[in-house]
From Swiss-Prot:
The gene is vps11. A zinc finger (RING-type) spans 871-906. Keywords: Cytoplasm, Membrane, Metal-binding, Protein transport, Transferase, Transport, Ubl conjugation pathway, Vacuole, Zinc, Zinc-finger. It comes from Schizosaccharomyces pombe (strain 972 / ATCC 24843) (Fission yeast). This is E3 ubiquitin-protein ligase pep5. One of its GO terms (biological process) is vacuole fusion, non-autophagic. CHCR repeats lie at residues 413-557.
Amino acid sequence: MSTFIKNWKRITLFQVKAIEENIDRLTSSFSSNGELVVFATAFGDVSIYNSSFKSLQSIKVEDESSIQQILWLDNKTFLLFSNVEGGTGTNSTVIIYAFSQADENEPPQFVLVTTHKFSINESPYPIIAVSQSPIDKTIACGFGGGLVSCYHGNPLRERGIKNSYSHNLGEPITGLTYLDDQSSVLFIATTNKTYSLSGKSLSCLDNTGVSLNCSSSCKTTPLQSREKNSSSFVCTRSSGLTFYDSKREKICFTFPGEKHYMTVMGSILALCYTPTLGTDSSTNEGLKKSFSSSSSIRKADASRNPAFPPRLLLVDLSRNLIVWEGHLKDVAVSILPLKHGFLVVTADDNVFELKRITLQEEISLLCQKMMYNLAISLAKKENMDIEFRESLMRDYASFLFRRGDFSASMDWYIRSIKSIDIPSVCLEFLKAQEIKQLIRLLEELIKTGLATSDHRLLLLSCYVEIHDSPSIRKLIDIGEIDFDQAFKICYDSNLLDEAKHLAIRFNNNERVLDVLVESEQYSEALRFFESLPPSNLLPLLLKYGRVLLDKLPEKTTNIFIQFYSNSHRGDLSTSESKGELKTAKSLRQTYLSLLPYAQVANFSLPPSLYEISPSQEENQRAALFSEDVSYTAPSPQTCFHIFLNHNSELISFLEGILPNASPNYKTLINTCLFEAYIRESFASSNVEKQEFWQEKSNSLLKKVEKNVDLNAVFLISQILGFDDGVRFVQGKSGQTLDIFRSFCQQNDIERALKMVRVHGPDQQELYIMMLNCFASLENVDSWYQDINEIVNIIVSQRLISPTQLLDILGKSVNIKLEHISDSMQSVLDNYRESISKQNEAIEMGKRDIEEITSQLSILRTRAFVVQESKCSTCGIDLELPMVHFRCGHSYHQRCVEDECIRCRWL
């Protein structure tokens, strides 16, 4: 804000209205309360006019005293002040006439209520200024001789006021006033200095004096740092205006020129002045010095240049505007503030009114002058219709936009956001390529709840254009956006991390995995699988499992195992990976073309590379999880096709889920696992590995023979040429003996022995048949160990008698007794040991019988002494009837039944 008032903007807000009425040339004082004007003459004549300068009442005061000052206490009460010469000539008498409105009549009529007279020990100098304190209603009078006299009390009561204290400054007083901010400080201006009087404490504020009628109180100070509605004491001097606040701090504004009269109405300051002779700084400095005293003022008056006629200036202090300026014929002018303007009384007693234009006209004029901010403030101050104010805001925003001040323009568009044409505004800023300002508007639409899905998409497009990744994520987190189009915008712009974040926010797991697989973030894809709840996992596993098996077979297999074994629970702790984003496509070509506002815009910002910082997944996903989630895995058969050409992973998968699989699925799993073993065996070129997998196949059949589909095993074994599987099924289907006979007929002793070892425990006759097979062989030299094994099994399990065993062995001419002597000796030893154990058991039984018989005999024939005196059950003294047992225990008959409770024996 400029402190040089002449640099303020100018606008004419007042109109001159001539008044035909003239006032009495003998008028000595006048005052106004805004609605009424009071004129008083030197002979005690008082005239009251309304704001249209129509005479309402004439009053003649007693003694025809010269009225020197008029003070309005309120709109219905005013005081007249006069200072007349006393009886001795060395003192004077102050007369205060109190007038009040008689009733509510129209037009108002005032009557004299009371008169107060005070004697002053001083020459009768005229009363220059009067003012009333807003706190204690103290009335201060300033005299031309330098005396300040204060009166306290109620002036409408007889003897209601008294002279409380006085100060003699010794300098002619030119003005005094109390401020309207509940302050008790009295500001006093003299010809040489400026003072403040608080109680009886006098302080000098400035060593520069003020001319007569050039000081006043002011409710507005033209400085933004000031407190609102803070009152000031304003003085106008040749150098400019000085404002003093209640804290005695001052603010100066430059306005060179000789000042003659000043008054204030609200925020409008009216000033009569004569322009300076020069405009350079040296001339202004000389004027400051020449106007520092009353003598210099007189010199300046004498040398006044008629080429510079006096002017009347109206300044709006609150808005820093010059609102009217015009020429006057003479400096001898008086200005009265009215409610809607000023009343100007010229030297020839002519009167004209400066009337303020209407509110609507003022706002219209401000808009024409491009002062939209002032027009808006005025409309708000006057509580005008909100729609009208918003129309002003829109016009101001449009003006700022045309001027190129896009930031300020957007500020005002945002303030009137509820009434603007949003598509048009968006289109304007798109054309101007002001993406950041457009972002501000769209963000405000979201805050105020006015945003549609299209607005959110446009905002997302703008964020993408300026590569504002954090803002993209915040917008995604807000939601309420068309997912498909938003995903397309991010995906087509290669913002894969943001596209993934969007898909996560909308719980679209398939899109998340699309992004991860597309960007070859296979490990991240697996971590995302781990984070999902089981209910969402199956279709995604079936869709992406094959790709992930090709890239990360082991980890992918583990996820399948967890899911199909009912151990998957999901994990919220997965984090988004870092990634460098590719160059963004043109805004026009990719995403803004999707929106209704971009059909005219044709622009694109230069592409660049940037990185997305990692962040945690959204809290909203927590709703999908629960600590006690329970689910039932589907049949493993649903994913078998995923493991095509991944036989090793299929084996790991089946082995992993088998322990926890449902009984309903174990047959399927075992059968499939058997096939996988066989295929792995035939796929290997290493003989050891082939034997290893074939052994696992046979071992599996033995372990889970009850949970395997024999028909499928038989079919698989036949197709893949696995004879062991075929024979296993034949054995389980009752064809074991036939298979064994075929081995014997072919002299395939190894396979026959293998079959005996496999099926012998279930079909023990195979051992006997195997022994017969050995007996029929011509050469048994390499089979003696196996023969002994078979013989031992037959003997240990007593499958046949020793005689039958010898008969079978006797059929062979090649099997000698010495070769199986150990086995036969073992048979004999077993028989001897068995007979010995049986004899020992018989002898022990006999001894036990003899001992028991002896004890029974003693119990039947021998007497015994009863020494118990208390019942062995209840512990109470025994009494008849009682029962005694030979074991030494005694009972009441009621406490026992048929046998001793403690011993339980006869």
